[in-house]
Design a protein with these regions (language model features):
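N-terminal export signals
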Residues: 1-21
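Glycine-rich FAD pyrophosphate-binding loop
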Residues: 61-80
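Beta1/beta-strand and adjacent pyrophosphate-binding region of the FAD-binding site
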Residues: 36-48
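Glycine-rich active-site loop/strand segments that organize a redox cofactor
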Residues: 87-117
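Glycine-rich loop(s) and the adjacent beta-strand/alpha-helix scaffold that form part
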Residues: 219-286
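Core beta-strand elements of the Rossmann-like FAD/NAD(P) dinucleotide-binding domain
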Residues: 38-40, 214-223
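Conserved redox-cofactor binding core of oxidoreductases
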Residues: 76, 119-215, 235-236, 283, ...
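An anion/pyrophosphate-binding glycine-rich loop and adjacent beta-alpha core
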Residues: 260, 269-412
Length: 466
């Protein structure tokens, strides 16, 4: 949400606000740096969506001198600048409040936090209009029904969604220009920050940061706001906190949990660490392109199997783009591991020839880590190919003339794949398609397409997303 006048003293989405230094903090104290390389009223660490709004409101509405530190070498923007760019439009505050209490079950989320979210969320369009964002208000998000669990008490009709044309990329360009107009400085290539804390009062008075290979000190006279995003690209944190592993992501590769480490160093406590707004997609298994890709099959000629080669789900109804990962948390004691993580998407030449399996540059849904609006230094790849062949050539999709050969190649990637089991699964699936009924998982008859047109293909499916 877009935080209003309280941004300099309270949390905004994806950020944490830390109190500034006291007036009697003398430079002679040992815990203070001998000198400051930069000084400001309000220090914002991270220039994604939360950092963008914190800096704008801090300077424009609160009248503070703001300095922003950004990890990326240029531009910044975070996930907010390469995703759909949607934001909530609250229609019924009391319904929304009831919904949040039902969804959180009043566990670990204080009512004051919910109330603050709603109070400021009611002003989203006000702030969007003030800063001249373009948007349309719709009753359904690109990702589907809103709110996510609208069947809960209070959920139905409590909110709409604002969709900006050009997605988050266009909104970022508008707001970044507003930031420049306000004279807010952003320092790029900033990393490895450590907060500077008064050991007696516990106040945060600034930070140290590496800019390139040089350590710099930054003094914050009024406060520090951490807007450093999540830990999508920190394997240790994902393994430690998330509810299954491996978990793979596309999106902003600089999200490595830096702010979480900073807070822990000064005695901060963590909460909600096992939560993720994510679905599932294809992991490339490519060290040079180490990210997830959202697959949008142009045809329904495919199935999902678990790691052992067994089909486990109605592939058309795994979950929404924000909760689809839940289906991958199944633990199998027979292998002492998560048997849906990874899963495999198995298909044949019919799907391969049906069209591109993901988004290309120039498509209507061109957003993510390949968009042409990203500078070369930040763009991870050039988007999906027109005919799917480049992804086979790179090894992202494996190919074989027979199911047995395909299963053998899959087993080279995951030892738990069983050749005989996968062959039996495909045979059973083809019989299901011939019968026109899926008695085990009840997939829609209109989508029951056999896998009998060689060659055959497969790719790994992991929980995760943007």
């Amino acid at each position: 949400f877009l935080k209003g006048a309280g941004v300099a003293a309270a949390a905004v989405a994806g950020s944490a606000a830390l109190a500034g230094c006291s007036s009697d903090a003398g430079a002679s104290q040992e815990w203070l740096p001998k000198s400051w390389d930069y000084e400001c009223d309000l220090l914002v660490i991270g220039y994604g969506g939360a950092g963008m709004w914190a800096s704008l409101i801090g300077a424009d509405e609160c009248g503070q001198q703001v300095l922003v530190l950004e990890k990326a070498p240029v531009r910044g923007g975070g996930n907010s600048s390469i995703n759909n760019g949607e934001f909530a439009v609250i229609k019924d505050a009391e319904g929304m409040r009831q919904y949040w209490h039902e969804m959180t079950q009043d566990v670990d989320t204080p009512s004051a936090v919910i109330d603050a979210w709603i109070e400021e969320g009611l002003r989203n369009c006000e702030y969007a209009d003030k800063y001249e964002l373009e948007y349309d208000i719709n009753e359904q998000a690109i990702a589907g029904t809103i709110p996510e669990y609208s069947f809960l008490p209070g959920g139905a009709g409590c909110q709409s969604i604002a969709d900006p044309p050009g997605f988050g990329m266009a909104s970022f360009e508008i707001l970044d220009q507003k930031r420049k107009d306000l004279g807010i400085e952003v320092l790029f290539d900033c990393h490895d920050e450590h907060l500077i804390q008064n050991p007696d009062t516990k106040e945060i008075v600034g930070c140290t940061t590496m800019i390139g290979s040089e350590e710099k000190t930054v003094k914050a006279r009024k406060g520090v706001i951490l807007c450093t995003g999540g830990f999508e690209f920190n394997e240790d944190m994902k393994r430690k906190y998330l509810k299954c592993y491996p978990f793979k992501f596309e999106g902003w590769k600089y999200n490595t949990g830096d702010g979480i480490k900073m807070v822990e160093e000064v005695g901060g406590k963590l909460w909600h660490m096992g939560m993720a707004g994510a679905m599932y997609g294809m992991w490339t298994r490519d060290p040079e392109n180490d990210f997830l890709i959202l697959i949008m099959p142009p045809d329904q000629t495919f199935i999902y199997t678990d790691r052992l080669g067994k089909r486990w789900v109605d592939e058309m109804r795994i979950g929404s783009p924000h909760n689809g990962w839940h289906a991958f948390t199944h633990f199998n004691d027979e292998i002492c591991d998560y048997d849906h993580c990874p899963s495999w998407c198995v298909f044949d030449q019919t799907l391969f020839e049906a069209g591109p399996m993901s988004t290309r540059q120039g498509d209507w849904f061109e957003c993510g880590n390949f968009t042409t609006m990203l500078p070369d230094e930040l763009r991870d790849w050039e988007g999906w190919s027109d005919d799917n062949q480049a992804e086979v050539d790179k090894g992202w999709i494996i190919k074989a003339d027979t199911i047995e050969e395909l299963a053998a190649k899959m087993k080279e990637i995951d030892k738990w794949m069983d050749v005989g089991t996968l062959k039996a699964t495909i045979d059973t699936w083809n019989q299901v398609c011939e019968n026109g009924e899926d008695p085990e998982f009840h997939r829609s008859p209109a989508t029951l397409n056999p896998l009998n047109n060689p060659p055959f293909y497969a790719y790994t499916v992991y929980p995760g997303s943007c």
